[in-house]
């Protein structure tokens, strides 16, 4: 009984996700990923007497990995300069020079959502729908006429948008409580953001296209192909760790309008596969390798007691806290031999309470 013994086991499934990430164990009543920052539950998790919890989080690891794999030098320059990629994209997107997290928090959050989702070929309808429910844990957001005008959307654009049957069908699939006109404005603003991302991120678009071609060339036909640290083979993609992401029984099927769509078996269901999804899988899998390498280095000195997303948690003697913070930082941003030149960044902090470890 946890209440009596005091220790909290954190049940994780190794390679629980298809990309290799850890997941909460099936049947577990504890999922650390669901503990919100500042919550009482998060703050109730404590290090043993005389110790602290050191938490280190790899910042924006997925956009950094994607930038390297796609040779997106413009984004890499932002990272190398220590800049804020979300604010930089937001400034470009909304034409607000010098914007930052404090001056324009809503616009920056929109840019963050776009950068994280659009990088994996997210379409405007999915982006619009996810914004309405809260993209990646952010507060729900619906773009207004003011936002649309800032993005260059005109009344004529709205009328033209509503005259296309395909757009109406996509809109009807989006759960909403606003009027159809308001939803159309929101969708057009979302589309403008997606379009601007793609126009400004041609290396990423080219990488999607490469991954799309490799679905047939390598994953289906079995012709081996290596791109940087990733190797494509018959129904599998080999990560830098040597582990494989698998796509069993991959085959072409007919989609809407006779278009060829690729699907693979996932248990009893078929799952679609396309360039953007392959990109997502590769980036998440490679980011997991970078994270795991850092964890293995840290574990040589301090015991790890958990990992949440791109964060590790170690137990450290209280008197070593400051030195441990510096040391953990160094282990997490150490050079990555299979991603030469990737500019890593990490935030590290400590406290006896987990919820206060990073401020």
Predicted regions located by residue number:
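Short, solvent-exposed polar/charged micro-motifs at secondary-structure junctions
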Residues: 21-22, 63-64, 315-317, 353-359
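Extended, well-ordered alpha-helical scaffold/bundle regions in very large, multi-domain proteins
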Residues: 117-214
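Acidic, glycine-rich two-metal-ion catalytic cores of nucleic acid-processing enzymes
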Residues: 1-101, 203-311, 325-332
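Alpha-helical scaffolds flanking conserved acidic
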Residues: 103-114, 302-303
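Polymerase palm active-site segment centered on the conserved acidic dipeptide of motif C
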Residues: 189-213, 319-359
């Amino acid at each position: 009984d946890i209440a009596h013994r005091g220790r909290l086991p954190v049940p994780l499934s190794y390679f629980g996700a298809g990309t290799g990430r850890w997941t909460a164990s099936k049947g577990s009543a504890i999922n650390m990923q669901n503990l919100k920052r500042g919550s009482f539950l998060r703050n109730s998790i404590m290090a043993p007497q005389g110790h602290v919890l050191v938490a280190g989080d790899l910042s924006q690891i997925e956009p950094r990995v994607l930038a390297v794999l796609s040779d997106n030098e413009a984004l890499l320059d932002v990272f190398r300069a220590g800049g804020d990629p979300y604010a930089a994209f937001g400034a470009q997107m909304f034409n607000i020079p010098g914007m930052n997290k404090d001056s324009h928090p809503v616009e920056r959050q929109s840019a963050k959502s776009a950068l994280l989702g659009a990088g994996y070929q997210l379409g405007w309808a999915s982006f619009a729908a996810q914004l309405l429910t809260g993209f990646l844990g952010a507060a729900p957001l619906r773009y207004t006429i003011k936002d649309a005008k800032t993005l260059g959307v005109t009344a004529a654009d709205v009328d033209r948008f509503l005259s296309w049957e395909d757009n109406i069908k996509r809109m009807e699939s989006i759960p909403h409580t606003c009027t159809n006109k308001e939803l159309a404005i929101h969708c057009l603003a979302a589309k403008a953001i997606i379009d601007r991302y793609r126009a400004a991120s041609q290396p990423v678009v080219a990488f999607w296209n490469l991954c799309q071609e490799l679905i047939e060339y390598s994953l289906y036909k079995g012709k081996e192909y290596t791109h940087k640290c990733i190797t494509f083979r018959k129904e599998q993609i080999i990560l830098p760790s040597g582990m494989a992401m698998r796509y069993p029984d991959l085959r072409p099927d007919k989609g809407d309008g006779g278009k060829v769509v690729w699907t693979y078996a996932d248990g009893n269901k078929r799952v679609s596969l396309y360039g953007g999804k392959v990109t997502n899988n590769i980036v998440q899998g490679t980011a997991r390798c970078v994270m795991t390498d850092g964890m293995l280095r840290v574990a040589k000195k301090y015991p790890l007691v958990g990992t949440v997303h791109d964060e590790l948690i170690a137990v450290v003697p209280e008197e070593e806290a400051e030195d441990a913070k510096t040391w953990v930082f160094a282990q997490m941003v150490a050079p990555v031999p299979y991603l030469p030149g990737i500019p890593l960044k990490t935030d590290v902090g400590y406290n006896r309470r987990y919820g206060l470890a990073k401020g």
